[in-house]
A protein has these predicted regions:
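Conserved catalytic or regulatory cores that recognize and/or transform ribose-phosphate-containing ligands
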Residues: 1-348
Length: 348
């Protein structure tokens, strides 16, 4: 599709920009709404520069727009309907804006970044950290975790809040926090104007078909010893069962992390089924992104989640993890010894 055709679909309200939003945190919803304001200004300015007049909706804001569209859906089907609606908007969106921050990237947003890359929608990472990441062994300095960086069409750091500043009391501190949000909103406006005038493109997809019976293990890329131990055990068990197995190892071995992250994505794309590890306070952001990428490419997904905690709001939301992770998986297992039988069942 040509850039002008894409811009015309945006202007007609057929391809709104998906502004990803943290689901559980009210501050995340506030931030998403603020960034959407900047996004709208920028989109309208960009369309005007092309001689086009934008017609609503130019943006899609999850939680607000999903819930509003699904009034009357039966309780037991509500969260599944949200997943389907959000996924549809990512697939046809002009772009995806992903506000991320903190040391644990939000798993739902990370999944959406990966899914966008898999279906060909450019994802823009908006980081709100005052810090960057450095990695032992390579001494690389990265704005975002390597796998997320590889999936994005563009990364921007909006985290201009400087911890070294001295503040003159409560009012000065509050004023500076508000000013930082104003600056972030303005930066998003300029970025979205540029997206319309000079479209970005998702990373090129691997030109490889999945090998029948091949399984890829995404247990965090080997950053922690427990991940490496569990992945090694499952690899041995799956190979004894006759499956060809690859393992994400971006944090092991030598070479630039971004290159190793690309190798993990290529290995997942070359597999018929991807097994992801969901254990932890939240699903690791890179693992969630790889799961989204695999699902976007049409690969099967097996989610391993041994946790006992449930996230409960009532019958409409009673889950162990973000609904994007749960509903995108073909099957979820609770114990390591269930993985091999589940792989057999999924791959026939």
């Amino acid at each position: 599709m040509s850039p002008l055709t894409r811009a015309r679909r945006l202007a007609a309200g057929e391809a709104p920009v998906y502004v990803a939003t943290r689901l559980y945190d009210p501050s995340g919803r506030y931030l998403g709404a603020r960034l959407e304001c900047g996004c709208l200004r920028g989109l309208r300015a960009g369309l005007e520069g092309l001689g086009l007049e934008g017609r609503d909706p130019l943006t899609f804001l999850p939680f607000r727009d999903s819930n509003s569209a699904l009034q009357g859906v039966p309780t037991e089907e509500f969260s599944r309907a949200i997943y389907d609606l959000d996924r549809d908007h990512i697939e046809r969106g002009f772009a995806l804006l992903a506000p991320l921050g903190d040391l644990q990237a939000d798993s739902g947003i990370a999944f959406e970044v990966g899914y966008a890359a898999g279906v060909g929608t450019p994802a823009v990472l908006l980081w709100l950290n005052f810090f960057v990441l450095r990695y032992d062994g390579t001494e690389e300095t990265l704005l975002a975790p390597p796998l997320l960086s590889r999936l994005a069409a563009r990364s921007e750091n909006l985290g201009a809040f400087d911890l070294s500043l001295r503040f003159d009391g409560r009012e000065d501190y509050l004023r500076r926090v508000a000013a930082a949000l104003d600056e972030a909103e303005a930066a998003v406006a300029e970025l979205c104007r540029e997206l319309v005038l000079r479209p970005h493109h998702p990373p090129p997809l691997p030109a490889v078909a999945p090998a029948p019976g091949r399984v890829h293990l995404e247990f965090g890329g080997g950053q922690f010893e427990t991940q490496r131990c569990w992945a090694a055990r499952l690899q041995a068990e799956l190979e004894r069962a006759g499956f060809a197995v690859s393992v994400s190892r971006r944090y092991e071995g030598a070479g630039p992390l971004l290159e190793r992250a690309a190798a993990d994505l290529n290995a997942a794309a070359a597999s018929e089924l991807v097994v992801t590890l969901a254990d932890g306070p939240d699903v690791d952001g890179e693992t969630a992104a790889l799961q989204g990428y695999a699902r976007g490419l049409g690969r099967k997904v097996l989610l391993y989640s041994s946790g006992r905690r449930r996230i409960y709001t009532g019958p409409e939301y009673d889950h162990r993890h973000n609904l994007m992770l749960l509903y995108s998986a073909d099957r979820t297992v609770r114990r390591l010894d269930e993985v091999v039988p589940a792989v057999r069942a999924l791959l026939g």
